[in-house]
Amino acid sequence: MAKVIVGYTGFVGSNLCVSHQFDACYNSRNIENAFGTHPDLLIYSGVRAEMFLANNFANEDLATIEEAIENIRRIAPKRIVLISTIAVYNKTYGVDESTPINKELSAPYGCNRRILEEWVEHNYPDSLIVRLPGIYGINLKKNFLFDMIHIIPTMLKEDKYEELSKKSKLIASSYSMQGNGFLKCSVKDKIILSKLKREFKNLGFTALSFTDSRGIYQYY
């Protein structure tokens, strides 16, 4: 039985690879090698999960969903397990697998991932869709636990960067433009990161300032 995974370098995929042996592992760099292989089982964990980017750039995010659909179609597995998210639900509590979902009421992140779920359900009636909540572990790159540990915002909107950079030369020199309305922290040096953490705390703005728009808990 040939078992393959797409998204093996991501948070979920990398942890699955530690606990399970796959016959082939793919990501965006080598995905074309998977086309036409018709594996018995495909674990698809290859959808980007930056909620804040998806909600700010809905069309671009939808394009990544369409790309995922095309990847699955061209891989043509016999069965599929899709790694999805509880963000497809319209509320953050009191829901289960039988809860109706109205995409029109969802933010782009949840709406677009529900579109992928629906395609998988239609084309693979015996598929398994796993909707993950906030998770933590090795290789964690985001969510409120990551923010509590690191404090420094990984990304800043241009207007927030302009505001903070006027108050701090260190912040001004620590972020680089991404071409999508956001700037990303480019600092790797531990000493500078320590100073940057103190700088954000002193200014009263840290990664914990971000929240999930559907709830009151610190999360994004």
Locations of the language-model features?
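N-terminal Rossmann NAD(P)H-binding glycine-rich loop of SDR-like oxidoreductase domains
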Residues: 2-22
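SDR active-site strand-loop-helix element
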Residues: 6, 44-45, 80-86, 130-132
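A short, well-structured beta->alpha microelement
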Residues: 21-39
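NAD(P)H-binding glycine-rich loop region in Rossmannoid oxidoreductase-like domains
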Residues: 33-77, 86-94
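Catalytic helix-loop patch of NAD(P)-dependent Rossmann-fold dehydrogenases
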Residues: 62-63, 93-130, 134
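Conserved catalytic-site region of short-chain dehydrogenase/reductase
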Residues: 82-95, 135-139
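Catalytic loop of short-chain dehydrogenase/reductase
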Residues: 88-112, 149-156, 165-168
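NAD(P)-dependent short-chain dehydrogenase/reductase
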Residues: 119-217
